[in-house]
Design a protein with these regions (language model features):
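Accessory nucleic-acid engagement/destabilization modules that flank
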Residues: 2-18, 24-240
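Conserved helicase motor
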Residues: 14-16, 340-353, 504-507, 526-542, ...
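Conserved Walker A/P-loop ATP-binding site and its immediately adjacent core
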Residues: 309-332
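Inter-Walker segment of RecA-like/P-loop motor cores
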Residues: 335-380
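Post-DEXD/H (motif II) to motif III coupling segment of the RecA-like Helicase ATP-binding lobe
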Residues: 387-396, 404-460
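Interdomain hinge/linker at the junction between the two RecA-like core domains of SF2 helicases
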Residues: 435-492
């Protein structure tokens, strides 16, 4: 049916069903205002606002407007897809600005808001600016129409202010770069930081654009983010609830007054005191079991209140830690509704899926609890949904728990991102770990100097020492076979009642579990844990393990991969850990005699598996870690006094990391790209590969401060290898089977399918293509 309506010629959005439309002026001003209000740096608001005004100017083209008119009259089927909306805005900006670097920055943001791209093409050397300058568009018409909507003189004045804003931004980068160059710690380069600035401004534009567009089609007023005043009120309420919660916990704790709780309180108080300081980069280095989750949260709440931060973002390396600590955070602050838990295993109640989807896209929540994978994707992925929420990291407090688990290949990217957020965007970062990586300077891209939030780590080492770590790697020449390890574990379980075995591969863990089932008495309780189990299976298994450990009525063995190594709150009498990094060994030791409940030292054995039992040929990081640990073990054997007679000393940890980093290949910490002879650090910096191609194409050097290959880098960036991207749903229990039955029904609506698939995530396992082929018809 045809709509009979009056057609305007400056349309930005149209809705056939209702006959409503939004003009270009309405949309561009909404986006400009929303993005500027969201921007946490007041000095950048004018520049961000200007970008909002120009971002969709291309929609004024005659072909675009004809498209909109047809949609209004005949419906969505009349729409011609793929018309360029961004090129005209960038070219108009370049015409208005005399300063090339400023116009290039703004136009690049506009060009990229419909999809990431490379500023210089790695294959043909063409720059993004050249590509858009050569593009055939309805430019003269668009320009004429635009200046009928906007006053040119007013925009010129805005441009002058934006130039000043840009120069201040560039000046900050140059000052930091110069100071970094003359110091012993080179902490980044201007190209990389300029690229991150661009990404955050792009984030603000995308968020504003998507938000206004969604509000138009939903026919609701433009939504507002939580205001600073509302956030301050929330922090006050959280602090009051937190202190009441901790007081009750202390009163109800039967071990109240013991030496561990005294030191936990001291650490918590030091974190509280640090909250009043202006420092923006901290390390919290305390032993496992010292309460760093709640201590760092206490710091964050008080610091957020004092420095008017918008968000507290808690990051954990694994879902197992995240789920456990998210629940602890919710209890402690007494306001579960302000905690956004963002990871793949979250299942929403009926009716709340859309709100959760929106929150995970924007992170518009006071407290966000998420994984290292999610935050690293937010910083470096090419996906627009990741870019959209990046600005949320600004003017926030970010707590990285178990920071040593950040992959080695991401190390320099991580360092530079932390430097950028803390030095330029008012963010405070806390790096938490019992085994902090060394801060000894590397050649370049170091993290800035950190302050220890709770003083020197060795102060608490003796108080929290609950285990003796014993080197048993030489018990079997050539390493233990599965049978040797199983007998060893059985013997230790007879002696210690409960044993946790942590191995480096899922195959070795499963084979050991099967062998133990064959040789252990029936009264033994045997458990197995690995990422080959679906999340619900892991949760149920952990619950059973904790129950038996608490009852202390049976001998128990748990054989696991490193999925239980950090953050899982249970305690065994003995731990057997296959040789890995010293950080892994110490984290594993944190699952032994956790609360000093044994009345003696717990025992942790480091064992060496044979090459046949534990195949590590494809696990380079583990082999590197083993080699670094081997040097520490040899030094300890020759002179244990240099490590204060314990393998978990600060001296041993420092020696381990120095060994580890010294043996890495060139560029291994810069995120090497297999198909390119370059790294992501390079692509997001000077992009020498692209610049060389530009010279070949144009016969001269490129004159730009934005040579980055954002798209190539973003597509290559993945924290976890693509090897495990095949998802398999396991019919683990009745609920899983019922959901699978529903999903197989014919004519199921798309929305219902999405709900079922979301609920099935707790029953889903990631496997490799190779394993999928091996399983064949079994899946």
């Amino acid at each position: 049916m045809e709509n009979k309506i009056e057609i305007k010629r400056d349309l930005a959005h149209v809705d056939y069903e209702s006959g409503r439309y939004q003009t270009m002026k309405e949309h561009s001003e909404n986006v400009a205002n929303y993005a500027a209000e969201t921007c946490s740096l007041s000095e950048l608001k004018i520049l961000v606002s200007l970008i909002g005004v120009f971002h969709d100017v291309g929609k004024l083209g005659r072909e675009n407007q004809e498209d909109f008119e047809k949609i209004l009259q005949y419906g969505d089927d009349a729409h011609k897809h793929g018309l360029d909306h961004s090129t005209a805005g960038g070219r108009l900006i370049k015409e208005l600005f005399k300063e090339k670097s400023v116009s290039e920055f703004i136009s690049t943001v506009i060009y990229l808001h419909h999809g990431m791209g490379d500023c210089i093409n790695l294959d043909n050397g063409q720059s993004l600016q050249q590509q858009r300058d050569e593009k055939q568009i309805d430019y003269d018409w668009i320009k004429k129409e635009f200046f009928q909507i906007y006053d040119k003189e007013m925009l010129v004045e805005y441009c002058k202010k934006a130039i000043q804003t840009y120069k201040e931004m560039e000046g900050k980068i140059n000052t930091f770069h110069k100071e970094s160059e003359i110091s012993k710690r080179k902490c980044g380069n201007r190209y990389f930081f300029m690229g991150l600035y661009l990404r955050i401004v792009l984030s603000l534009l995308i968020d504003g654009d998507w938000t206004d567009t969604a509000c138009f089609f939903q026919d609701v007023p433009l939504s507002k983010r939580i205001s600073l005043e509302e956030t301050q009120k929330i922090w006050n309420e959280c602090i009051e609830n937190f202190e009441q919660y901790m007081s009750k916990e202390i009163q109800n704790d039967p071990s109240n007054g013991n030496v561990l709780n005294t030191f936990r309180q001291e650490i918590s108080d030091l974190c509280r005191q640090a909250a009043d300081k202006e420092q923006n980069l901290y390390r919290l280095t305390v032993p496992t079991g010292a309460g760093k989750t709640l201590s760092s949260l206490r710091f964050a709440l008080y610091h957020a209140k004092k420095t008017k931060k918008q968000h507290i973002i808690y990051i954990a390396p694994f879902n197992s830690i995240l789920i456990q600590n998210a629940e602890e955070i919710r209890k402690a602050i007494g306001k579960a509704d302000i905690v956004l838990e963002h990871h793949c295993n979250v299942v929403c109640e009926d009716g709340k899926e859309e709100r959760y989807r929106k929150l995970t896209e924007t992170w518009d929540s006071p407290i966000i609890v998420t994984t290292a994978v999610q935050i690293l994707n937010t910083l470096f992925s090419a996906q627009k949904s990741c870019i959209r929420r990046m600005h949320t990291l600004c003017n926030s407090i970010i707590i990285f728990d178990e920071v040593q688990a950040i992959p080695v290949k991401c190390m320099e990217l991580f360092n530079l991102a932390v430097n950028f957020l803390t030095q330029f965007w008012g963010t405070t970062v806390v790096l938490c770990s019992a085994t902090q990586p060394t801060l000894a300077p590397i050649k370049e891209n170091n993290i800035c100097e950190c302050i220890e939030m709770a003083g020197r780590p060795e102060k608490y080492a003796n108080a929290f020492k609950r285990t003796d770590i014993k080197d048993a790697t030489e018990l079997y020449p050539g390493g233990m076979e599965i049978e040797d390890l199983s007998e060893f574990v059985k013997e230790k379980t007879e002696q210690y009642q409960s044993t946790l075995v942590i191995l480096n591969t899922t195959a070795c863990a499963m084979n050991t579990f099967q062998q133990l089932k064959a040789i252990c008495p029936q009264e033994y309780e045997l458990f197995h844990l690995s990422n080959n189990m679906c999340p619900q299976h892991k949760l149920d298994t952990l619950k059973s393990i904790k129950q038996i450990l608490n009852e202390q009525s049976k001998k128990i063995i748990c054989v696991s991969t490193q999925v239980v190594e950090a953050g899982v709150n249970f305690s065994f009498g003995c731990v057997v850990r296959s040789k890995a990094g010293l950080d892994n060994i110490i984290q594993a030791a944190g699952r032994c005699n956790r609360h000093k409940e044994l009345g003696r030292m717990g025992t942790v054995f480091i064992v060496q598996m044979s090459e046949k039992a534990e195949k590590l040929s494809h696990l380079q990081e583990i082999r590197n870690a083993q080699a670094a640990l081997q040097k520490v073990l040899e030094d300890y054997k020759n002179n244990s006094l240099k490590f204060r007679d314990t393998l978990d000393s600060e001296e041993a940890i420092k020696a381990y990391y120095l060994n580890y980093y010294s043996q890495l290949r060139t560029n291994e910490t810069k995120f090497l790209i297999d198909k390119q002879t370059t790294t992501i650090i390079e692509l997001l910096g000077e992009n020498k590969v692209g610049q060389l191609q530009y010279i070949r194409r144009n016969g001269e050097k490129v004159k730009t401060k934005l040579p980055q290959a954002f798209l190539t880098a973003g597509q290559a960036f993945e924290v976890i290898s693509n090897d495990y991207k095949v998802s398999v749903v396991v019919p683990y229990n009745d609920e899983a089977r019922e959901l699978l039955d529903k999903l197989s029904q014919d004519y199921l609506e798309i929305e219902e399918q999405k709900k079922i698939l979301k609920k099935l995530q707790r029953y889903t396992v990631g496997i490799s293509e190779k394993r999928k082929e091996k399983l064949g018809n079994a899946i």
